[in-house]
Amino acid sequence: MERWSIDIYKEYFKFSAAHFLIFPDGSAERLHGHNYRVFVEIAAELTSHGLVLDFKQVKPIVRELVDSLDEHWLVPGKHPVLRWNERDDGVVEVRYLERYYAAPRSDVIVMPINNTSSENLATWIGRELHQRLRARFPDLALHRLRLAVEETAGQSGVYLYTANEAQAPTRKPAE
């Protein structure tokens, strides 16, 4: 069986963000930041024009997602112990065990994840990208979406979506 894919990485597929990771034993890193980079692979049937997708149509979608996270403090809103609250004055309070933080709402993104690991960030971005690709390209016969979030050189968390072969739409490849 033949498969086709496109790999997309641009220098602007990056975001700088603060976070702290919470470990299984309850300990946590100090608040710190990374300059994250995002890499995307999309595998699908070829269009009648011999393309998986046009790069120039995908790049703005990825850029919008990474830009939405840039220069924010990422808080894991679904962590079972961490608590957060937005005060009436627009300040977000975050409590984890004995730690207390307060920051302007505009600086904080409370994410629907249980930890701000690179794996969870890749999952969130990957799922958002998948939804946007489906909405923008309803005829896309997507087989696989791979999205990596690199927090430091050579160290990435990866989200991988693979379509169920029985449910995956197909397009006739270019002749």
Label every model-predicted segment.
Residues 1-175:
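Charge-rich, low-complexity N-terminal segments
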